[in-house]
């Protein structure tokens, strides 16, 4: 996830709890990492469609709700802009206006079709 995390647990089985938390984070990262070409999210980004696992579907559905609640200020389809600015690779650059316009034309969660299991 390229995110620094710190876990603190107290109690009799605190080490086990931390180990389980780390395993769960790794499992979810395996589903959602855009830096892993075999992740569920990467496959959907590459094909433009796909059947979602239960975990991904729950996050996707909540993301779509937040998109609606914020009038589109939060948008699940922002990945083309992230790529353009170089966030996934760490090779950052300021895009040209025409590049921004092209990438922005791909960002619009309202165009996503969702039936509760499959996103298109």
Residue map of PLM features:
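A contiguous, well-ordered beta/alpha segment that forms the leading edge of an enzyme domain
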Residues: 1-120
């Amino acid at each position: 996830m390229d995110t620094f995390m710190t876990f603190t647990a107290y109690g009799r089985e605190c080490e086990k709890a931390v180990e389980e938390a780390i395993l769960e984070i790794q499992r979810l990262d395996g589903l959602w990492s855009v830096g892993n070409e075999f992740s569920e999210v990467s496959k959907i980004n590459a094909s433009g469609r796909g059947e979602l696992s239960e975990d991904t579907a729950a996050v996707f559905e909540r993301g779509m709700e937040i998109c609606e609640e914020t009038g589109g200020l939060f948008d699940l389809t922002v990945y083309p802009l992230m790529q353009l600015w170089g966030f996934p690779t760490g090779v950052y650059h300021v895009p040209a206006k025409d590049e921004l316009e092209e990438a922005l034309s791909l960002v619009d969660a309202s165009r996503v079709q969702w039936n509760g299991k499959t996103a298109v």
